[in-house]
Amino acid sequence: MGQTLSEPVVEKTSEKGEDDRLIYGVSAMQGWRISMEDAHTAELNLPPPDNDTKTHPDRLSFFGVFDGHGGDKVALFAGENIHNIVFKQESFKSGDYAQGLKDGFLATDRAILNDPKYEEEVSGCTACVTLIAGNKLYVANAGDSRSVLGIKGRAKPLSNDHKPQLETEKNRITAAGGFVDFGRVNGNLALSRAIGDFEFKKSAELSPENQIVTAFPDVEVHELTEEDEFLVIACDGIWDCQSSQAVVEFVRRGIAAKQDLDKICENMMDNCLASNSETGGVGCDNMTMVIIGFLHGKTKEEWYDEIAKRVANGDGPCAPPEYAEFRGPGVHHNYEDSDSGYDVDADSGGKFSLAGSRGRIIFLGDGTEVLTGSDDTEMFDNADEDKDLASQVPKSSGKTDAKEETEAKPAPEAESSKPADGSEKKQDEKTPEESKKD
């Protein structure tokens, strides 16, 4: 079981912004964990590389979520620097944004590896980002954070969760000399792509893309239409608890109620937060969530009105009205979400609440979103986790699942996180050797 506090840290760090193209909100919460290891970036309007407006005629926006494990150092570095590093890539400067994102992820990895300040660093992080250029979204992902597009209330994931048991990931891992055991890379790391985690990137004979764990991202390009309402980027602290479709419907209800996007993020995190930390699993993780709304030439008020009108007319699925209520941390809603229409929820039967079905929800590379059968008491137990993976995943997918966990390993000392009043939370009586990092 991972280390948890006697009470969750429910204070949230939130921000919002807008221009004539986009509106966004973001929020982050430490929750039950003893420290905050998530980071994020939200850049509404970035100048083009070298101020070259001929090659880059569209305004550029960049948003990302970085879920750390083993410490916060790599996640913080990525959140503060990855967009600048991406913009410096020659491929990006030439206008090839997809390749620029791929090159930028690997360059971020190299920058950390080559910085003497991080010489002994053992932590890593996911990276799920979106670049918005004109009417195109470029989503780059390494790890199991996720981007999901809301299309008139229907969820369309724009990233795949990189889990070691996926066939393509397992093939790379084994070809590089690693193995997958209990759903983990070398029996340790339960995601197969990440920035950092350099202990899995030591083969001098292999390219960065072919290491046991790689920072090389998948990139999805999507051309926006009037039906595309918003994009959600979040860490697995959200996706462990809710299906992609459930999140989209929740966000849509908040928009219909004219709530600010950062407040919708806060409400979602409160809804995901576990009522207690006895299990230390689902609902006990750090949580970070970004919502980006696409105005399509409308004002912010017109955008809100348009979505509210669609909801009132039954134009696409939406959560019930009570989901716009702010009930406070750990007070859960419960209802069956809708079929997204994008073949991501057929096997999950995803519930909107921790009070409903329990277990880890993952989006697999074959387009299937799976709700595992595990009770969250197993999520932080290395001995028991994934012992019945074959029964948890539909046979047609041929894939399995594991909650992202790493074996306990020493990490550089980081500043401790405290609540706003400066008081410290009492930790459960667990030693680091008895705990695993998320």
Curated annotation (Swiss-Prot):
It is an enzyme of class 3 (hydrolase). It is found in: Cytoplasm; Nucleus. PANTHER family: AT28366P-RELATED, PROTEIN PHOSPHATASE 2C. Dephosphorylating regulator for many key proteins. Negatively regulates the endoplasmic reticulum unfolded protein response. One of its GO terms (molecular function) is protein serine/threonine phosphatase activity. The keyword Cytoplasm applies. Keywords: Cytoplasm, Hydrolase, Magnesium, Manganese, Metal-binding, Nucleus, Protein phosphatase. This is Protein phosphatase 2C homolog 2. GO terms for cellular component: cytoplasm; nucleus. Residues 375-387 have a biased composition (Acidic residues). Residues 23-294 form the PPM-type phosphatase domain. It comes from Hypocrea jecorina (strain QM6a). The lineage of its organism: Eukaryota, Fungi, Dikarya, Ascomycota, Pezizomycotina. Its main location: cytoplasm. Residues 370-438 are annotated as: Disordered. Its cofactor is Mg(2+); Mn(2+). Residues 398-438 have a biased composition (Basic and acidic residues). It catalyses: O-phospho-L-seryl-[protein] + H2O = L-seryl-[protein] + phosphate; O-phospho-L-threonyl-[protein] + H2O = L-threonyl-[protein] + phosphate. Belongs to the PP2C family. Coiled coil: none annotated. CDD domains: PP2Cc. Mn(2+) 2 binds at D67, D236, D285. Mn(2+) 1 binds at D67, G68. Binds 2 magnesium or manganese ions per subunit. Its EC number is 3.1.3.16.
